[in-house]
Amino acid sequence: MYLQVETRTSSRLHLKRAPGIRSWSLLVGILSIGLAAAYYSGDSLGWKLFYVTGCLFVAVQNLEDWEEAIFDKSTGKVVLKTFSLYKKLLTLFRAGHDQVVVLLHDVRDVSVEEEKVRYFGKGYMVVLRLATGFSHPLTQSAVMGHRSDVEAIAKLITSFLELHCLESPTELSQSSDSEAGDPASQS
């Protein structure tokens, strides 16, 4: 699952993402290797602790982040939050939370982008296109597999922000002018 809808009202849309089953399975698998190495080795206690700690470190490093996206019309802001257990442990609980705040009126488009994921193929993510010309992904990592889940979230955000209604009159007149000037349509 790409993102889950936590709350949805007329003025607030709260989306969340937690590490998936693949991520947790990888954590358990890597940690099991460390525990097995410690249990079955004839090494000293220090080495056994090293095996478990090393595998725990690698396992947590491969754990996906917790992510949130909060679209709030009352404050006029989009808040994108990321929590990383790996960063939290690495900095001894001083860091681990990243937050990006964007004004709602700066969001011009919401689209789905395809990203190549090493060894696994293609992943998909929602990207916010801003008035400043920048693009910012809604989440830090792409989801594997079903593009339809990601497209559903993009449509949900587009309808919440009413972006489909924001086509300017100049764009409409330009598109109608180009259709009128098309020789194929003047038969």
Swiss-Prot record:
Highly expressed in macrophages, neutrophils and monocytes. Signal peptide: none annotated. It is a single-pass membrane protein. This is Cytochrome b-245 chaperone 1. Its main location: endoplasmic reticulum. It comes from Homo sapiens. The lineage of its organism: Eukaryota, Metazoa, Chordata, Craniata, Vertebrata. The gene is CYBC1. The modification Phosphoserine is found at S168. It holds the Pfam family Cybc1_Eros.
